[in-house]
């Protein structure tokens, strides 16, 4: 599934569901198009609010909601327009729906436009 925003930006998850075992390393990938201000990852547990994980920039750098969380990181491949979320040494508590999102670059200042983030999701399931 692809989500296209009003600025011609799209973001697409590469696989919808990942089946992993505890202790595995997992990389989730989304591809995007267009000029972006930043790329974000969110997590959502069943019947819970969306939880911000981190934000990355095409030019490098970014920020995490919890800087001490060393098992989660992101990487952006600007040339190929890929954004990755990496989870190291997964735990059962990592089972959730993960959303990749982008904020398009806007040439004129309009506060409401920055609220229109485009999102797509991955589902992380654990198997025996």
Predicted segments, located by residue:
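Extracellular domains of the immunoglobulin superfamily
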Residues: 1-128
């Amino acid at each position: 599934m692809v989500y296209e925003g009003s600025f011609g930006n799209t973001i697409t998850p590469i696989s919808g569901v990942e089946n992993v075992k505890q202790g595995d390393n997992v990389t989730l990938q989304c591809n995007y198009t267009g000029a972006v201000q930043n790329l974000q990852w969110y997590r959502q547990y069943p019947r819970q609010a969306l939880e911000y994980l981190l934000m990355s920039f095409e030019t490098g750098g970014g920020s995490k909601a919890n800087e001490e969380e060393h098992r989660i990181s992101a990487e952006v491949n600007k040339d190929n327009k890929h954004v990755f979320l990496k989870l190291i040494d997964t735990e059962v508590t990592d089972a959730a729906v993960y959303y990749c999102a982008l904020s398009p670059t806007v040439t004129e200042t309009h506060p409401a436009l920055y609220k229109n983030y485009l999102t797509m999701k991955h589902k992380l399931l654990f198997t025996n």
